[in-house]
């Protein structure tokens, strides 16, 4: 039950009634009509912009349209009052029974409350993480992983059919660099190279990856093959070490993701796409539509991009699809550019039936967005839509001081180190407390504090307190069925008559609307903000009982009022658990 959606339908029905009476013209576009909470609670329960949206196309003043709608709305579908405000907004007040009915729905549905059919089961592909298989994941990867996973869960909650995908970049120069680093570690393991020589190679940048994570892989190769690889040419050992390195690093990445509670449905290999002829297939398709040509690009102004060369190149007509320049598809050696593989990959997604695609990328990929969107438009003939979400950096701190380098990775703090230190639930929640494109400070000291300044503690504490009320209720009223279903059926919710209680009910009723708006905007951080509001309101209700015993949730001498308040408490717990479920965070029942 989405009470905001229901009232919007009521508003639109009254617009239609005014059209039928000839007071408003037919054919008005109502798509931008919205019903939402007012900016100030004193103004009412809801506000609508209907008059503001419809006035101009109707050829009327906004207040004139508002007055007509106010006249129609009062007394309909639980609307007890409506008034025009400002230039033409309409503030609405609902019969409290409407809100209490929503509370019963929360109790009946539990964590399923808030689920929506907005997505209509449409298939959407969320590609996230997609880190090069060259080592363990760092904290920046972790933020992208949490964001992508939570966004996928949010879309599922709102009615989309979601596939979580990881694109394995296993065909580029980086995996060759990995193979060379692994080979050097192997030489150390078999005694063909000493540690000092390895360190010198690393310092001279002859090898790129120096972290300890390659040591056990090299040891396994040494144990299995002995010194056999020390006497063969690079052309012989490079493919073998590349394959072993990719396999082991991908396994390491999957372990890191599992520790964070992230599981992808699909892993797609760039190398496999190329070998299967997907790039050739994509080229044939683009050429058949005259979207590929041979030409020489003008030298770009300012910083020269990596893919610009002063020679004739095979180019994709990206400018026809919103990009700034046409893009090269082949390198000077005749091999495909990374972008060509990317086009083929998105062509493959489209052929798999995805008209909705979301790519979660690091903030350093900002310059890549336009060309990716152009590619998706081209390969899908405009049928598919791509949204690219850029995830900003994470700064690791401890009591405000930057955290030092990790020995395991050699150059950065690994995601696994952070998860092992504070737990996956803390990492996941904190990563979602800021919008994805805003930088985030992750302070070990702060995220483990038991204060209201720590958002994950504050929300979990609210859930734990709600659970403690339920446990206490079982002792206070022994033999009573206090299940959510029983409370929905028997509790007299009219006894929730305090302003603070009804404000809490209205806040909970807004959960389905929040789910839909956050899903539509692809912004799961809105859930974190909402959970913070719910927690603050609930802690406020709890604290008033400290000041006045009559305001406590449970009154041994007033069972009816206690059950009504317990119903509210159970609903709070359900909504918090529902939000945490989207985040992949286990709700705490008891603080330890």
From Swiss-Prot:
Its EC number is 6.1.1.19. One of its GO terms (molecular function) is arginine-tRNA ligase activity. One of its GO terms (biological process) is arginyl-tRNA aminoacylation. InterPro entries: aa-tRNA-synth_I_CS, Arg-tRNA-ligase, Arg-tRNA-synth_N, Arg-tRNA-synth_N_sf, ArgRS_core, DALR_anticod-bd, Rossmann-like_a/b/a_fold, tRNAsynth_Ia_anticodon-bd. It catalyses: tRNA(Arg) + L-arginine + ATP = L-arginyl-tRNA(Arg) + AMP + diphosphate. It is found in: Cytoplasm. GO terms for cellular component: cytoplasm. A motif ('HIGH' region) lies at residues 131-141. The keyword Protein biosynthesis applies. Keywords: Aminoacyl-tRNA synthetase, ATP-binding, Cytoplasm, Ligase, Nucleotide-binding, Protein biosynthesis. Belongs to the class-I aminoacyl-tRNA synthetase family. Monomer. This is Arginine--tRNA ligase. It comes from Rhodospirillum rubrum (strain ATCC 11170 / ATH 1.1.1 / DSM 467 / LMG 4362 / NCIMB 8255 / S1). The gene is argS.
